[in-house]
């Protein structure tokens, strides 16, 4: 464990509140190892620790606490322009260890957003791989990582193809992602 990770963990503990912990456990029932930290604090920490780079992203993810994984996703968002394809590889690796909707959505919607247009093909390739997974969180992620592209009408047929592949999925959180993408189309987002 690096000194930088210890410093981040110390700061996370300093920002812990019982209200935030109760809220996280209420809204993310299967969250594990919850500190109890509000999202705005994580956003500030992501910017503060960007110099930790990809090494800190990996360390945070591997530490395994709920907010550490969220912070890893947010930090990746801040630094992904340094190496978009490596950032995508991290998202692919992280996909195997996702265990709740909040981390899934943070990884899928935030980690690659600044480089999504630049690596669009590669993101769709990863989506195509994840959609076939037995892991429900990888299937959900297969839609969440392409949500950013719902604003582009030229990509709607490709996105709808994926939505249709998961329309009959048995898993609640996969169904929620399907509904979410369809709603984006209906609202023109």
Which positions does each model-derived feature cover?
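Alpha-helical scaffold domains
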Residues: 1-189
């Amino acid at each position: 464990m690096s000194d930088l990770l210890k410093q981040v963990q110390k700061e996370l503990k300093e920002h812990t509140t019982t209200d935030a912990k109760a809220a996280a456990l209420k809204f993310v029932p299967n969250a594990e190892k919850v500190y109890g930290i509000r999202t705005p604090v994580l956003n500030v920490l992501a910017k503060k620790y960007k110099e930790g780079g990809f090494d800190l992203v990996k360390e945070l993810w591997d530490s395994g606490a709920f907010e550490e994984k969220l912070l890893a996703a947010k930090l990746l968002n801040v630094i992904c322009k340094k190496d978009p394809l490596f950032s995508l590889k991290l998202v692919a690796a992280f996909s195997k260890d996702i265990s709740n909707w909040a981390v899934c959505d943070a990884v899928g919607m935030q980690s690659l957003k600044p480089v999504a247009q630049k690596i669009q093909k590669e993101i769709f390739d990863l989506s195509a791989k994840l959609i076939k997974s037995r892991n429900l969180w990888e299937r959900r992620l297969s839609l969440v990582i392409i949500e950013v592209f719902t604003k582009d009408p030229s990509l709607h047929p490709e996105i709808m193809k994926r939505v249709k592949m998961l329309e009959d999925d048995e898993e609640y959180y996969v169904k929620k992602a399907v509904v979410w993408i369809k709603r984006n189309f209906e609202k023109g987002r």
